[in-house]
Amino acid sequence: MKVRFQADADLDRRIVRATRRREQAISFQFATEARSGVGLINLPDDKVLAAAASEGRMLVTHDRRSMPQHFGHFVSAGTSPGVIIVPQNLPLGVAVEWLVTIWSASEAEEWANQILLLQK
């Protein structure tokens, strides 16, 4: 199965829009589209991880500070489709290219319980 992405509430919306524009077949939800439109706004990290996992989506976030720790706790108790951390200073085009490459060159199962920090 192809990777499906879920943006958290803090991810720059331009990343979602540009990725969707670059490859229309990619399933990438804004934070407001998650949980059948209820969204991920103002949820703690553990609930965001649970929501993404319940929909079988890799979480895409800028949160390098607390998300890795919450992710570690989450996968110690269950399974996650994975997390991608996009540094705030990563150029938009580079972030989009990474996400499109991950989507096109891998399967969702390969990312289970994995966390990836994107680099330039």
Regions found by a protein language model. Give the residues of each.
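Acidic, metal-binding active-site segment of PIN/NYN-like and related structure-specific nucleases
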Residues: 45, 51-72
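Acidic, PIN/NYN-like endoribonuclease modules and their adjacent C-terminal/linker elements
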Residues: 3-35, 39-42, 46-49, 71-120
